[in-house]
Design a protein with these regions (language model features):
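Short amphipathic beta-strand/extended segments with alternating polar/hydrophobic composition
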Residues: 19-23, 58-61, 170-173
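Mixed-charge (acidic/basic) macromolecular-recognition segments
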Residues: 33-131
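A broad, structure-centric signal for solvent-exposed, well-ordered loop/edge residues
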Residues: 16, 28, 54-57, 152
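Short coil/turn linker and secondary-structure boundary residues
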Residues: 22-26, 68, 104, 119, ...
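Short linear, low-complexity motifs centered on an aromatic residue
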Residues: 30-48, 153-165, 169
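Acidic, proline/glycine-rich low-complexity IDRs
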Residues: 5-11, 125-173
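N-terminal ordered "arm"
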Residues: 1-44
Length: 173
């Protein structure tokens, strides 16, 4: 999924030019060959996000990409198979304050978070009722279920998050 992914490495050295890169290999190659106007190698860069998918953009925001984290970012970006994994990862890091390191994988937190897509708590309650989360309810009793009250109860266990333009509700285990 990284075919549109583009970054710019802006040197902190004002006598040097930056460079665009789309992969770790390209970054390493350009990093090693880039010199300032005095012929000295450039050591520090600000990494600027230029282009990518919605999931790659969110991943960039989550990882607070700095020069030393470029290999980790590309490792995680290569693991993107769907938006759900990135949403789960975003919630784990941003809302649940999970720590990430060089060994972290994109799906490490999937088993710890239950995510549901809905616009409001009432929509979530109605979704749960329709999916049978309350068990089999006889037809003659279905009109007595108060979706608003159930939605209010769900607020105790589920939290709302806006990730990648999606409103999701999650519960962590």
């Amino acid at each position: 999924m990284t075919n549109t992914l583009t970054f710019f490495a802006q040197p902190y050295d004002i006598s040097a030019c930056g460079f665009y890169f789309t992969s770790l290999d390209e970054y390493n190659s350009k990093y090693k060959s880039n010199v300032n106007s005095y012929g000295q190698p450039i050591e520090e860069y600000e990494i600027q996000y230029i282009n990518g998918s919605k999931a790659e953009t969110e991943l960039f925001a989550i990882t607070s990409l700095e020069q030393m984290h470029i290999p980790q970012y590309f490792k995680l970006a290569d693991q993107i198979t769907n938006d759900h994994d990135v949403i789960s990862f975003s919630i784990a890091v941003n809302d649940l304050h999970k720590k990430i390191d060089a060994d972290t994988n994109l799906d490490d937190f999937n088993d710890e978070i239950s995510i549901h897509y809905a616009d409001t708590y009432k929509d979530l309650a109605e979704q749960f009722i329709d999916e049978g989360m309350l068990g089999d309810i006889p037809q003659h009793l279905q009109n007595y279920i108060d979706a608003d009250a159930y939605a209010n109860d769900l607020k105790c266990d589920y939290f709302k998050a806006d990730v990648m333009g999606e409103t999701v509700f999650y519960m962590s285990f």
